[in-house]
Amino acid sequence: MYDFVIIGGGIIGMSTAMQLIDVYPDARIALLEKESGPACHQTGHNSGVIHAGVYYTPGSLKAQFCLAGNRATKAFCDQNGIRYDNCGKMLVATSELEMERMRALWERTAANGIEREWLNAEELREREPNITGLGGIFVPSSGIVSYREVTAAMAKIFQARGGEIIYNAEVSGLSEHKNGVVIRTRQGGEYEASTLISCSGLMADRLVKMLGLEPGFIICPFRGEYFRLAPEHNQIVNHLIYPIPDPAMPFLGVHLTRMIDGSVTVGPNAVLAFKREGYRKRDFSFSDTLEILGSSGIRRVLQNHLRSGLGEMKNSLCKSGYLRLVQKYCPRLSLSDLQPWPAGVRAQAVSPDGKLIDDFLFVTTPRTIHTCNAPSPAATSAIPIGAHIVSKVQTLLASQSNPGRTLRAARSVDALHAAFNQ
């Protein structure tokens, strides 16, 4: 019997595993991942941005964890020889309406404690000669990294400390009892743990349902489609270039991202995926689609954002529409500059009343902890999220009448926080 089993080999699961074994070095800990390696889904299909925390509600978990995670991610990369580029982010306003929205973002960045610089049109042009706008906000702490590399390094540390990673282990059933949890896999394996931690991303709600519980949310998969610019445009921007988002819309808009390999990507958009892991336009699952359309919460989301949703679908099918979005601030790009690039799928939790759950969300039972909503900036925030989960583990252990083996904490969660806040 394991002391802890973690489900999910993305960056949240690996960060949690790495920090849990740091706090409890004598614990028997296993991580189950349904794929043949780590970071195969959201972690390995995002833009790689180290976010600063510009957009998030002051005081929210997203705001707190993103600010701490920005520092922690860079510190982890420095300690483990992982390359990153602290290139900074430029938020660009292209209309008077966007200038008003930019002023609101300026106030929010101040509330979140983020260093930033206000630029007029001339100053913007000096920094970014190929970008057109009325003004901008420069955020120097934003950067770029390969989260696949970060996750692989976390896995290596976890294993070096005695943790066990079991790949090709897709969880198909869970049974919670007073002394622990039984985990069954589609491959025929069966594992038992005193405490279970689920970091299951796109499958988060289904893991809660396996316990016979009503999760109170449903995961809605949104595909984010990207293009890569032709190589001759690898130097077209000096920073990450973001539009000013519409506060009525749930996503940030199409942006230019300088990748860690030197290439530049355009995207992502946000299109409803008709399969939980539907990375291609043609991917379709009848059961997943039935589940999506059968959810009153998702139907309300689609109704509330019908016009923008149809626009996203149109631009997904017609590259010229996608191009127009980026030409608003980078007019020199043409259709021939947009080359295919792999898409990602966001796991967005939706409430029964049709709200996109805005903050990170965790659900606990006497023997389990579930990470239920961890969209962007979860990759940036992975280290503080992992520490937060370890803190929840300690609370859970203290409340259990029969916690199993007595485990000695080698360090406190406060020490984890202190380490990545230095």
UniProtKB/Swiss-Prot annotation:
UniProt EC number: 1.1.5.13
Keywords: Cell inner membrane, Cell membrane, Electron transport, FAD, Flavoprotein, Membrane, Oxidoreductase, Transport
Keyword set includes Transport: yes
Primary location recorded for the protein, binned into one broad class: membrane
Cofactor: FAD
Molecular function per GO: (S)-2-hydroxyglutarate dehydrogenase activity; 2-hydroxyglutarate dehydrogenase activity; flavin adenine dinucleotide binding
UniProt cross-references to InterPro entries, sorted A to Z: FAD-dep_OxRdtase (IPR006076), FAD/NAD-bd_sf (IPR036188), L2HG_DH_bact (IPR030862)
Pathway the protein contributes to: Amino-acid degradation
GO biological process, one term: L-lysine catabolic process
Gene Ontology cellular component list: cytoplasm; plasma membrane
Recorded superkingdom: Bacteria
Location in or out of the cell: Cell inner membrane
Function: Catalyzes the dehydrogenation of L-2-hydroxyglutarate (L2HG) to alpha-ketoglutarate and couples to the respiratory chain by feeding electrons from the reaction into the membrane quinone pool. Functions in a L-lysine degradation pathway that proceeds via cadaverine, glutarate and L-2-hydroxyglutarate. Also displays some oxidase activity in vitro on L-2-hydroxyglutarate with O2 as the electron acceptor, but this activity is most likely not physiological.
Family the entry assigns: Belongs to the L2HGDH family.
Name the UniProt record assigns to this protein: L-2-hydroxyglutarate dehydrogenase
Species this chain originates from: Escherichia coli O17:K52:H18 (strain UMN026 / ExPEC)
Gene: ygaF
